[in-house]
């Protein structure tokens, strides 16, 4: 039984915002909250799908919805954009629909002719966005590979006033985001994910009205290579880890919570990565035969 005093409910909290008394419950059903946010996102994606007829415009609107979702809920240390990823040798990836990169340790971003270019060292994750997952797993994998093959650098940095050694390169998360799946069940997607090899392997994805998934891999520690010895060995170490991947399990969520199981899995992977390695700016400046002083 609710207990009230002067019209106020003892089971609720109250606060003033803009001189208005607002009421909210002391307890909230998290499942209802997740369902509400999921339905809101799905409704927006379905509006794009049903009412935007031009394929290019429909795709751009869908990409922007995913970007805005991740910008809203990821911590401020991460930035999210559509971009092309570059390395210090001038190589570039394919244009990625969603790139999650470091907001602090990204010393420069190029914008030219409507395209954004982000250094590979700053990238945490990349995703391909499609309306339907059908026929697009391999395509997404090839685009993810175009980022992972880039030549990343890593140098020492100052941490809490002390010089820290160059951090070993971290994995780059790769995945696919879609509004729907026209496959009957999840087995076809699982088979396609199992067929991916090496740098093309995907880590997770969200098929919004079907379920999210993550891929659990068995990986083999490379022999005879120390990931901390030098940057060349470090690159080879990461490559061999990817090449050793064997799918242990592809796990799908319930469709009712696909969006937030995907999001929380992504956050967990980002937490595991920590912070991206410090970029070697002088490696990029070699292109213009210049160099900066690294100390002060």
Predicted features and spans:
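Intrinsically disordered, low-complexity Ser/Thr/Pro/Gly-rich regulatory segments
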Residues: 24-95, 100-296
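Short hydrophobic alpha-helical segments enriched in small aliphatic residues
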Residues: 3, 7-12
């Amino acid at each position: 039984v609710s207990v009230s005093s002067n019209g106020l409910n003892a089971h609720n909290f109250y606060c003033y915002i803009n001189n208005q008394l607002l009421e909210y419950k002391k307890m909230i059903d998290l499942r209802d909250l997740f369902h509400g946010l999921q339905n809101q996102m799905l409704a927006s994606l379905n509006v794009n799908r049903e009412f935007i007829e031009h394929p290019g415009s429909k795709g751009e609107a869908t990409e922007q919805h995913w970007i805005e979702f991740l910008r809203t809920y990821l911590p401020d240390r991460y930035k999210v954009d559509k971009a092309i990823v570059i390395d210090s040798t001038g190589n570039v990836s394919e244009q990625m629909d969603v790139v999650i990169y470091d907001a602090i340790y990204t010393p420069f971003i190029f914008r030219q002719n409507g395209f954004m270019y982000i250094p590979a060292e700053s990238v945490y994750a990349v995703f391909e966005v499609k309306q339907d997952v059908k026929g697009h797993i391999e395509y997404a994998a090839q685009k993810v590979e175009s980022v992972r093959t880039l030549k990343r650098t890593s140098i020492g940095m100052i941490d809490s006033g002390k010089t820290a050694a160059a951090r070993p390169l971290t994995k780059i998360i790769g995945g696919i985001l879609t509004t729907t799946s026209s496959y009957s069940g999840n087995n076809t997607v699982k088979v396609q994910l199992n067929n991916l090899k090496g740098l093309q392997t995907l880590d997770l994805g969200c098929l919004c009205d079907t379920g999210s998934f993550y891929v659990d891999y068995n990986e083999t520690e490379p022999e005879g290579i120390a990931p901390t010895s030098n940057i060349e060995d470090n690159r080879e170490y990461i490559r061999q880890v990817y090449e050793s991947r064997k799918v242990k399990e592809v796990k799908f969520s319930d469709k009712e919570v696909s969006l937030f199981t995907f999001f929380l899995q992504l956050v967990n992977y980002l937490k595991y990565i920590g912070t991206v390695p410090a970029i070697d700016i002088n490696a990029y400046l070699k292109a213009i035969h210049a160099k900066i002083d690294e100390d002060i």
